Amino acid sequence: MSETTGDRLRTWRAGPRLGVAYYNEYLPDPGRLADDLSLMHDAGITCIRIGESVWSKWEPSDGRFALDWLTPVLDGAAEHGIDVILGTPTYAVPRWLSRKHPELAVIRRDGHAVPWGGRQEVDYTSELFREYAERVWRAD
């Protein structure tokens, strides 16, 4: 299977892949990243999934995007022949968003709002949530 992105042609490996979720953003040490990617390559890992659940890392404050942390992971994976699935970070909203819009919280059956700090604590059907989510999806 191939796809064209810009002026580059990307060919995907045929057949099943062995992949893992990789959260380098929790321990952002360049030496660890290099070691982890080498170990994954040696173990036959062909794909990593990154980026989800860290909206606060993508957008540390309202409208300010900081995506430079992704570059070493993407470059390192490419150097090791590991494909990347870049997840969207929208199932764990940043604290600034929950403070700015407390109405986005899911309301439990008992009538209380789900507090910030877990995952999936927002109302995904909210138009306002979807506007913020789309904004982070399109960040560059």
Question: Which residues does each PLM region occupy?
Answer:
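Boundary/entry segment of secreted carbohydrate-active catalytic domains
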Residues: 5-32
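The substrate-binding groove and active-site-proximal loops of carbohydrate-active enzymes
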Residues: 18-28, 53-70, 115-135
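Aromatic-lined substrate-binding rim segments of carbohydrate-active enzymes
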Residues: 7, 33-109
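Active-site-adjacent "subsite" loops/lids of carbohydrate-active enzymes
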Residues: 92-140
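Short amphipathic alpha-helical segments, especially helix-boundary/capping motifs
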Residues: 10-14, 47-51, 112-117
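Short, acidic/polar
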Residues: 26-42, 133-139
